[in-house]
Structure formats: structure tokens, C-alpha cells
């Protein structure tokens, strides 16, 4: 026994030919069908949808509740679903169609706009009618529809959601299901920082037994909050013979927060996942985990898609046991082995970018980072996008213990081509955790010294420690008062807690 359903998110975007009656690229539909067939070959249920077309922030996004030309949107939406439904009309009940993904106007603060919500309801009705009209097994296929942003409260509450009618269903009954997503509390489940890393009863135990700081625990959205929302779903839909699918849920990997307690943090993650899955199952709802394929820091991944190996076996087994036994607290005693990966050498590197993109990127950058020919060269763009070596020299730091270290770049007149920086930072090749403490940061521009009282120290996208000093793209970062130097930049900092990183 294990997972029995795969949700396949499908975006169409520029694969729709607007000039040719909204024809979908046949090669793309072939690929969608190929993936569906993979699932069928394993006896799995499959959910396919129109996924990324409804985001205001996505290039080529067109399926917008707040779009100006709603007639065009409805016409295009109907045409696309007609083609999808016709392609899969002979597939049996293992294939489920989902009308859309997290459809909203891109505003995440405040209640839904009722005019836009009415557009969403209209889309759902077009979806149902269009699929049914394509005939064959689509006349009685199970169909899945969401409310505003697939949000539980905005679907069950008095915000405007209306179930579409299913009068054309040949099964003699409505075959409609409701889709919601659950990622509460978001600061625990999805915010990419290492501050909120504990949740619920499991988190309380870690505070009491292991001495975790109380500030690391989510301050809202505990078990009782979840219970209340799921009860509303059960009362409104399940008890009225309308099935509910939790189409996405999950929380990201924050196990690097404390190097010596990664197992406990992952155990709490397993408990949250198991609680959602177990509570859903106990109320007659189906949970579908969101695995985005990423298994690093802040990833949702549970297995490696290249090796097919489970990367989070404890989380997987907790979810399975929670659903099997309809037990939300199946993961309360979950133990995950602490994985303390220490290194024999740790290094720090200055990173810089001027307003005309004379730069050295982070050491973890895939294109210009530590393992490339560009990393030890301060480079600028010349004519025809040619990379020019400025001749500047870098001094990096090898960190062997707690102490004070300096990284620098010198030998180039920065003021000759720029009046300001876009970015100034220190990148490293060792994992960030909350045991590490950075202080006494001083930026030096030639002879000008600038003390940084509250440096922004965090994990980069690879999970390594990163000190951000200047970033014009981060409006929350305090401005640095400096003059562009004629010869050198340096950053000096003191670091403690390196025994959590360095092997003895």
C-alpha cells in the first residue's frame, strides 16, 4: 500500500495558437498523454488540469479572473478544454479532470473580489458543460472544481463560491468534486527562511525536551485551527455527497536550521504532513501531497526523480500510516535520523555587482560560481556581450575555527564606471544553521569603514550561509552609506558556532 493518485499539473500558455481557433500544440498533448499513460500503467488514478495559465505573474498568462476581455477568455478556455477532453475521451474513471489551479486576481490580502469570483464560477460551469458535451466516457467522468485560490475558507465561507450544475452527467447523479489546497500556517509551510521551524504538539515537545527556542514555533494555524477548517469542508461538502480532494499540501525542508537537530526538525515536518493527511482521511477527504521535485533546503520533495529513491522515507511512511489508520497523530512519535554533514574546510568569498554589471557572483552560482573559470575574475561586459577580465584580485577566507575573517577585491577603480552597487555580499561553501552567529561586520571602501549593526545572515538557494550587505532588489535591507572606491572593497566579520560545521 502507498500513494495511489498522481496529480499532473499541466500549463498550456504559448502552446495555444490564438490565431488558429486556440488550437493546442498536438505534440504537447502527446506529452501529456504519455505522462498519463505512465500512471495508468501502474494502476494509479491521475488528475490533470490547466495549471499555470491563470497566474497574473506568469508570462503569457491569459486565464485571468481579472482579465479585461472575459468573452475571449471564456471562448479560449472552452476551446482548450474541448481539445483536452476529446483527447482523453476513451480513458476510464482512473482519469480525473480538474478545471483550473489556484485561480484568483493575484491579490492575497483581503477577501475575494465578488465580481472576479463570479468569473471563476462561470469558468467552472463552462468546464463541466464542455467536458460532458465531448461524449464517450467524459459523459460520466469525475470532475474536480476549486474555489477562489483553492483556499478552504474562501470555498466554504460566504465569499461567492457556487458549485456548477452537472445536469448532463449520464451517470444519473452529479459527479463533481471540490478541490482545495492547504499550506497553513504559511510561515511554517512555505516561507523560505529558518525562523519558523516548529509546529503543533510535536513542536511543543521539541521546545520542552530539546530546548528549542519558543520563537521558532508557528504562532497560529495549529491542530485546532486545521480541525475547524476541515470540519467546515466536511459539513458543507462531504456530508452532502460532494467529495473533497486536498489537491495540494506540504511543508518545505527547514532541517538545516540547527545542524545537530535536523532529524527533530524533519520529524516535526513529518508530523505536520501526517496530521493533514490523517485528518483529511478521517473526514472522508483525499489528500494529495505537493512534491515539486526539489530535495534541497526549502524543497517539498519526498523522493529523487532521477534515482527513484525515497529521500524522506519517514515522511512517506507517516503519511501512509496516517491515511491507513485515519489517525492525524500518526507522526507524533516519528523519529528521523539526524544527518550532520560536516566539512573539513570552510570558505568565504566576497561577491559584488555594480550598476553596469561588473560582477562576481555567489560561489554556488551554476554559471559563474566557484566551479567555473569566471569565479576568480572580476568581470564586466564588453561589446557583443564579451566578458572582459578587469584585472582585479580576490582574497578569500579559509575558515578553520571561530574567529574574525576578511574577504576582499582590489586592483580596480570601481568609481570609473559606476556610481553605486547593485549588490555586495559574502557567500560561503558551508551550510547555514541557526547555531552560526555573525557579528562585527565592517565594510571597507578604500579607507572608508562602515560598521553594519544588523547584518542580514541567511541561507542562499543552496542552503549555504550568505551575508547580504547591499541589494537594490531587496527593499527590506537597510541602505548602506558608501562612496565607490578607486581600488578596493573588503568585508570583515566575526563568526561563532563553526563547530556545527567543521569536523573535529
Task: Report residues per predicted region.
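Short beta-strands within extracellular/lumenal beta-sheet-rich domains
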Residues: 391-413, 463-480, 491
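Aromatic-rich peripheral "rim/lid" segments of glycoside hydrolase catalytic domains that contact
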Residues: 256-345
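Extracellular glycoside hydrolase catalytic/binding regions
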Residues: 79-82, 86-89, 93-94, 104-283
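Active-site mouth of glycoside hydrolases
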Residues: 1-142, 147-155, 310-315, 319-322
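N-terminal targeting leaders for non-cytosolic proteins
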Residues: 346-400
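Exposed low-complexity, polar/acidic, P/S/T/G-rich flexible segments that act as propeptides
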Residues: 434-448, 501-504
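Catalytic domains of carbohydrate-active enzymes, especially glycoside hydrolases
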Residues: 1-11, 233-236, 277-279, 286
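Extracellular beta-strand ligand-recognition surfaces/modules
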Residues: 410-433, 470-471, 486-490
